[in-house]
Regions:
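A short, hydrophobic beta-strand-centered structural micro-motif
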Residues: 59-74
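Charged, amphipathic alpha-helical segments and their flanking helix caps
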Residues: 1-47, 71-177
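Short secondary-structure boundary/capping segments within folded domains
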Residues: 57-60, 80-81
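Short N-terminal edge-element motif at the start of the domain
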Residues: 44-58
Length: 177
């Protein structure tokens, strides 16, 4: 069995020796290497939440299917007992179809559901690797289908992945004036 290539992790910084998971590189690699994604013409894009779809919009005239990772995340830092930071990354899926063709839209949704399933089959293996670096993927990954008015002529869905990492919150006098 050949596993997908492991994307490099973000390097640690001098003040925070924690590792971090690069979700953008991970899903870009999966999009390039997945047979279904390639067969259906999925293109990888970076976006900034629901309002920042500039890269996708620029490619919509020539491409028909998209995997978009948001470069922003929601999250929090827990300062009790074992300090850790939780970040939630969002991955959008979109496929163009003829406007008002509900059968075509359903075929697109079925393709995106299957692509999500295939991506999760690799994320299970990635989760094990990440745990070796004290990075924990929340096993409850939400998948939401977006109604037909979000992006005209596109079936859209998104999923969110919660990731928790150790956060070094030791007071360091070198960081303060």
């Amino acid at each position: 069995m050949i596993f997908p290539k492991r994307p490099p992790m973000i390097e640690e910084t001098p003040n925070n020796p924690s590792f971090s998971w690069n979700a953008t590189a991970f899903f870009e690699d999966l999009t390039k290497r997945n047979k279904l994604a390639q067969k259906k013409g999925f293109t990888f894009c970076r976006v900034s939440g629901l309002d920042g779809f500039e890269e996708l919009l620029g490619k919509m005239m020539t491409k028909t299917a998209f995997v978009c990772v948001s470069d922003i995340s929601q999250g929090f830092t827990d300062i009790n007992n074992t300090p850790h930071t939780r970040r939630v990354k969002t991955v959008f899926l979109a496929m163009r179809h003829a406007i008002d063709d509900m059968k075509a839209r359903e075929r697109c949704m079925n393709t995106m559901r299957e692509l999500f399933r295939q991506f999760m089959s690799v994320l299970i293996m990635e989760q094990t690797r990440l745990q070796e670096h004290s990075i924990y993927v929340d096993p409850r990954i939400s998948f939401q289908e977006i109604d037909r008015y979000f992006l005209s002529g596109c079936a859209c869905a998104y999923f969110q992945i919660g990731v928790e990492t150790y956060t070094d919150l030791q007071y360091n006098t070198d960081e303060w004036l």
